[in-house]
């Protein structure tokens, strides 16, 4: 566990996009827990969003729990702010279907964050039937716990439970 976290920290210090992606690809099979997965947010990736998006879409199609979780985490960290955001990313994440707890929780976390940053676009996904019910309810719960979601928005979200 500690060795993998150290390896992840070294990857995060990478200053070159190509070498960072290469090291990340080699490291993916060793990610076996949520903590190691969620710490991986190399800053260099934020300067190469179009290229990174291709990788993210590949990773979203993976059968591996933590590769899918990493892809959603990258979408949450790098693509929900106004400069990089596009509505289609919400649809991509909503389409992720998994029985894996750590994937479902990341989808919920993504949508809770989307409700804080892109409320109007994320809100329709909180309607019943737009995603797996358990995940939808978790997303609402996490949004209600967030300090970044306004009291008015929280009041409406409560009515959707």
What are these regions (language model features)?
Residues 1-161:
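Alpha-helical scaffold domains
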